[in-house]
């Protein structure tokens, strides 16, 4: 690939830049920047649409997952992302069911060529709650059945079948623990997490068919100086076995990382979010950018 530089005497000097270097520069850009670069020229559009580049971009993106913040104000949403700390102690996929009523469910499969909603049936009428999670193609979420009995629903996006985990031990936050469904429970009646909490429990679903759970208890380090009495919400667990919590305290937004192996707490301030302190905020882990999805829109 060639580029031209204008010298002081007004002449131009064409430079040959290795394509590998160009690709490496593009790989460091965000999806939004890649979209703009595709509009620069046909050559750039061709280069950035090649399978080699899109696969390599996804591989790099998987190695550096991000935190995704979604702000809701009225009917409007604003999405922001921030690098997800991979080692905080050193400072440093898609179908989704949408419940319409007790009996009907709609799904939309991205990338299938047929961008339309389809209706599927479920054998047990239920009403879904917030806080679902997707693990290896299985979507888990809480739901109410019969007289508002609480169950965990498992929807397989491949077979489009529903399964039910009846008699869930506790109504805790659904998180991904080493590829297994887990329930996070702080040691309080009100399921709050703050600086005075001394331990947390994790129930791990070891066998979905037999509905067998294992219990894990973690004794927390002294952390009142870091968290005070601020109530936090559990976002989930990273692939490096770190619980992630978030909280808005006054004008500031904080993310806390608890490493269960090192038994340490790390507090990170997310700057630039002061304008959204009065908005409803949703935080998601392991956000990965994929430039291949831009080809469908």
Curated annotation (Swiss-Prot):
Disulphide bridges: none
Pfam families given in the database record: F-box, FBA_3
Top-rank taxon: Eukaryota
Domain F-box, residue spans: 11-60
Stored InterPro entries: F-box-assoc_dom_typ3, F-box-assoc_interact_dom, F-box-like_dom_sf, F-box_dom
Any coiled-coil regions, as ranges: none
Protein name (Swiss-Prot/TrEMBL): Putative F-box protein At2g19630
Lineage: Eukaryota, Viridiplantae, Streptophyta, Embryophyta, Tracheophyta
């Amino acid at each position: 690939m060639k580029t031209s530089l204008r010298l002081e005497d007004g002449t131009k000097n064409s430079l040959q830049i290795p394509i590998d270097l160009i690709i490496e520069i593009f790989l460091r850009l965000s999806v939004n920047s890649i979209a703009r670069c595709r509009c620069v020229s046909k050559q750039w559009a061709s280069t950035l649409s090649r399978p080699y580049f899109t696969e390599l971009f996804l591989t790099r993106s998987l190695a550096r997952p991000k935190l995704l913040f979604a702000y809701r104000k009225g009917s409007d949403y604003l999405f922001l992302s921030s690098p997800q700390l991979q080692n905080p102690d050193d400072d440093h996929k898609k179908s989704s069911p949408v419940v319409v009523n007790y009996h009907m469910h709609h799904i939309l499969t991205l990338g299938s060529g047929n961008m339309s909603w389809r209706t599927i049936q479920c054998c047990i009428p239920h009403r879904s709650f917030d806080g679902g999670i997707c693990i290896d193609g299985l979507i888990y979420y809480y739901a109410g059945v019969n007289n508002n009995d609480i169950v965990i629903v498992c929807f397989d996006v491949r077979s489009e079948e529903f399964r039910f985990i009846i008699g869930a031990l506790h109504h805790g936050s659904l998180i991904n623990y080493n590829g297994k469904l887990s329930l996070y429970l702080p040691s309080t009646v009100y399921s709050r997490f703050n600086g005075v909490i001394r331990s947390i429990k994790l129930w791990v679903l070891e066998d979905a068919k037999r509905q067998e759970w294992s219990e894990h208890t973690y004794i927390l380090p002294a952390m009142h100086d870091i968290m005070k009495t601020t109530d936090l919400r559990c976002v989930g667990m990273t692939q490096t076995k770190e619980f992630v919590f978030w909280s808005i305290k006054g004008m500031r937004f904080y993310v806390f990382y608890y490493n269960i192996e090192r038994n340490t707490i790390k507090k990170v301030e997310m700057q630039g979010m002061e304008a959204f302190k009065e908005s409803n905020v949703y935080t998601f882990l392991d956000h990965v950018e994929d430039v291949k999805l831009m080809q469908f829109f």
